[in-house]
Amino acid sequence: FLTGRAMHSCFYSTAYWQKPHELKMDNKIWQGADLIFDLDGDHLPGVTDRDFPGMLDVIQDQAYALWNDFLEPEFGFSEDFLQVTFSGHRGFHLHYRDPALFHLDSEARRELVSHIRGEGVDVQGGLTRYNDAKANGWTKRIRTQIPTLIEKLVLIAERNDEANRIMKDLHLSLKETLRREGKPGKGPTSIQKLADMFLHEERRNAVENGQISRLGALQGLFLDLVKSDASIVLGAAGETDEVVTIDVRRQIRWPTSLHGKTGMRVTEFQFSRLDRDGSNPFDALTEAFVFGRDKNTNVEIVVDDATLRFGENNYDVTLGDKLNVSESAATFLSLKGWAKVVI
């Protein structure tokens, strides 16, 4: 069927029906649905798909952390029911098929997503087990994230070359977290005040050891930043992919099919390969291209700037650049609207 009717993209239902052959949805009789976690790199704070390799690295790390920090230790999910796929474009799917969870309705699935995102999480309470190396979930993420956040705040306080970018990223993440929780927003001025407090070495060391009270009136802001900077991103701008997880009638891309916006294959692989620091990490920009690899196609770049990688070949391109690339690369660039083929 598929070879005879080439189509833009191919999907299948993650729901189970008593009468799937019925034409009307009301007559199919819903029986349950798989759990889908769709992590998409689009619109991540500080990340752009114009740096396509960098974006995929970030979202691959997020997908691995989602399973390693939450789904397995917090919820007891088993790898026996897990299918991992590269979406063919900007992210990864964690497809969980445990029959014991098929019955979960949208509200139950929304609660699961809310916990992962840290909505309503008591970061202050998590500090009670700050030095417990065996703690998982949000306690673990709080413990590991505080030193990282402090490093960022110190760079802001020192007016480092990276200060503006770091400030923008932190502010965007914080703004989204506070919006979801219905809290009043905090601007860059407040973050700058907090950052300046970390120029004091003794205070910095105390906070790194979990003594958040040393920040006085700004400790609440610090804890909100910890939460927002450590949260798992389940969607573009915090919305799109939550819908994927809570939707009990969702369709998802068919593994081995091609993504119509890139020409890349929706690729299934073992969970262990999701770890970029592992012995055999999955590399979408090598493994998901299916067309020719020989450099025999001339293209002209039609966007201002982009960072690209096709296998071992890296490119930093700008408007008007002309490249000789493989059929796979030319297909990707054309479908993305980033280049045109030159005869």
Task: Outline where the language-model segments fall.
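Residue-level detector of short, conserved catalytic/binding motifs and their immediate flanks
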Residues: 35, 92, 252
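Acidic/His-leaning functional-site neighborhoods
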Residues: 272-274
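A generic structural motif
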Residues: 89-91, 328
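Signature for HUH/AEP ssDNA processing cores
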Residues: 1-87, 99-106, 111, 118-230, ...
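C-terminal accessory/binding modules appended to enzymatic or scaffolding proteins
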Residues: 239, 246-249, 255-266, 276-329
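Basic amphipathic alpha-helical segments that dock to polyanions
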Residues: 332-333
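A short beta-strand motif that forms the metal-chelation/ATP-contact edge
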Residues: 92-98
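A short, conserved structural fragment
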Residues: 337-343
